[in-house]
Amino acid sequence: LYETGVRKQAGRVDNGDTLLDHDEMERSRGITIFSKQAELATPRTDITLLDTPGHVDFTAEMERTLQVLDYAILVISASDRIQAHTKTVWRLLNEYRIPVFLFVTKMDQPDNLQSEILTELQDFSDKIVAFSCYEQGTVHTSGDFYESIAMASEDETILNTYMEQGALSDTCIQTMIKQRQIIPCYFGSALKGIGVDALLNGLDAYTTDAYQTLTEAPFGARVYKITRDEKGNRLAHIKVMQGTLSVRDTIGEEKVTQIRIYNGEHYQTVPTVTAGHICSITGMETAQAGDGIGDYSDNPMACIEPVISYTITFDEAVSTRLMYTKIKDLDEELPELHLSWNEPTETIQIMLMGPVQIEILTQLIKNRCGVVPTFDSGK
């Protein structure tokens, strides 16, 4: 965001001044909890960035955004290398068939050698190719760039093209990335801004717009997230997969009353959006995360689901049944919770991923309802 001029200075999550981690819980903890949208532009490409949580307890929040991605940027710490959660994210990207760009950060720290890290990454996937080289605080393109791409593709036609021409066209590389024949990997330091320009140049050169031919089709979209704004308005966050959507259009029996394009916590309203755009709409009171709306019915099942069930209780002076009606909206925003009422025991049941999610949910309920819930040990 800083490199493309969206921000005048780079934010740091531990300083609480990032554009996207604007929720108070995110700023106080220094982690991303909720996925956020930002708009930026490179010389050739307008990009919508969806920033997602990296903590394992919020994997379901991350997975919801995978349903609407054209490309993913997977950030890996050079110090931590490939962790168990990295493998989970990788599996999800494979499940959703999403083309991936890798960015290995913290290369400026001692003992982080690109050759060692690249070898470990290529043991993980032989499709990974270094698209930049990090040496003593600078980034450049390697001399065997095209050869590495051709070898990783394992495609005889591409190998022959390289042998004959000594290079590969941007269009050829675009196709290989889109078809997941290769996975470009960039190296640098996000904190110091090293290598970020190389990644942006790669996104500019090697991504394609698949929606230009779909704007005239009947409107169809995917709902990937439900939230409520500070005034309680219900927002359906959607990716327009085809066609055009305008304010006052009817979807089923509901009318779109507003279309918002968010940039961090701020937004602008627009009259119309077309295929390929991500936006938030008001007026949709029944659509749920994962739904296809309009002329789009593809409805993927979530791969990540919590497996631990918890019982929520409150102070004796608080009606648990009443609290259930107040917090039921959370189930729309976080469907992985599977919030339910147990009539025989008159308790609230919920599914959660881990202790950090419990802490966040406790704070959410306190903020919205003014009471503090108690969770049992789970089963």
Regions found by a protein language model. Give the residues of each.
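Structural and coupling elements of P-loop NTPases
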Residues: 1-379
